[in-house]
A protein has these predicted regions:
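Glycine-rich phosphate/diphosphate-binding loop of Rossmann-like nucleotide-binding domains
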Residues: 1
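Anionic-ligand binding patches
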Residues: 5-144
Length: 144
């Protein structure tokens, strides 16, 4: 765990992943002659940008004029003792090991459903990230 604390996992790494997804989506759409007004992506990951290990979702929305907006979901903490395992594998595998395998968690509900006792799901976190990303679009020039 000492080795893990030396590593700085910035939230920008998650943003880069989400931006790459949008870039690839736009390329796919162009290659397959698919027209869209907006291109959306979401990326989830672990970071310690606040000095604590957290899982955060970042949504990126880009239009055809390369105007981009992004938003984040609420983040939730990862215990220090589990952070290194999450970095080496992924959150789902660590949760399987700690909480037991659960097919519901691997579908729409996500591990956050278990951690919040059914108060929040993966869909909720994804929705919040996209709503935050949409603020630049729904407010026009006022918020750009």
């Amino acid at each position: 765990n000492t080795e893990c604390k030396k590593i700085v996992w910035k939230i920008s790494f998650i943003l880069i992943g989400a931006k790459n997804r949008v870039k690839n989506l736009k390329l796919y759409a162009e290659k397959n002659n698919i027209k869209a007004d907006l291109y959306l992506s979401i990326e989830s990951g672990i970071n310690n940008s606040l000095g604590r290990w957290m899982i955060t979702n970042i949504a990126v929305i880009e239009d055809n004029f390369d105007f981009e907006s992004y938003g984040t979901s609420p983040s939730f903490p990862v215990p220090d003792r589990l952070a290194e395992d999450v970095i080496r594998t992924d959150l789902s595998q660590v949760m399987d090991k700690v909480l037991g395998e659960d097919k519901e968690r691997h579908n729409q509900k996500g591990g956050i459903q278990l951690l919040t006792h059914n108060k929040v799901t993966r869909v909720d976190l994804t929705e919040m990230a996209f709503i935050m990303a949409l603020t630049k679009y729904i407010n026009g020039d006022t918020w750009k």
